[in-house]
UniProtKB/Swiss-Prot annotation:
Binds 1 divalent metal cation per subunit. Its EC number is 3.1.3.5. InterPro entries: SurE, SurE-like_Pase/nucleotidase, SurE-like_sf. It comes from Methanocella arvoryzae (strain DSM 22066 / NBRC 105507 / MRE50). Its cofactor is a divalent metal cation. It catalyses: a ribonucleoside 5'-phosphate + H2O = a ribonucleoside + phosphate. Belongs to the SurE nucleotidase family. This is 5'-nucleotidase SurE. NCBIfam families: PRK00346.1-4, PRK00346.2-1, surE.
Amino acid sequence: MTYRILITNDDGVASPGLMAVYEAVRSLGEAVIVAPASQQSAVGRSMTLFEPLRIEKMNLQGTMAYAVNGTPTDSVIMGMYVVMADRKPDLVISGINIGENLSAEAVTTSGTIGAAMEAANQGVPAIAVSMHVLEEADKFATAAMAQDYAVAQRLIGKLARQVLENGLPEGVDLLNVNIPAGATPETPVVVTRLARRMYDTIVHHRMDPRGRSYYWVDGTIVADAPEGTDLHTVHQRRQVSITPLRLDMTACEQTVEIERIIRDNW
């Protein structure tokens, strides 16, 4: 039976990173692109509940694609239950995101990872792929989309084949892959754990011409992430980070301690 691969992202259906994934995996089976119609960065795993979703067919460099007027999670759901309703995909790949998605902070805010988490929630293994860029401003700049995806494509092809043929290890629902800026085929690939956070939060206060306050949420990158974390691996060591993730976020190690606290205080 031919493998089926659903490709999505959070940068929108026009992002070159989407086609880069398609080119990397098209030889492995039937690859289908279903992605947000517009930029959806930092929406996490949110979904649309209070307005209808629409799917528009479009041509991407000669390839049929489907644009969804919703979030990355909406795109995964529409991909599985509408576009590929006859048979679910065997793998979902989200990316290639322009800008790294590192730390536990990114897991809960990134639309790229959110799409992969929704795939896992639907019982389909998933890979989220992001590329580190050196300038923060490039993360949402159209011009920055013209990246060299060759190293990422090579890695995606290898990972996709492995997951399609063997699945993910028990207890792993998805892989979060981050490729450092300037990576080459010789760049080491390291299995990592999540850093706690990627940014120290900053809130900028401004005044509009009518004297009313408004705010921009911003941040500076954490510079002292522990060794072995995804953030340290990509930013300090300039190595490829692969972090295995699971949907169950229960802090099992502390269950007994929480039970003691409840018992002693209620």
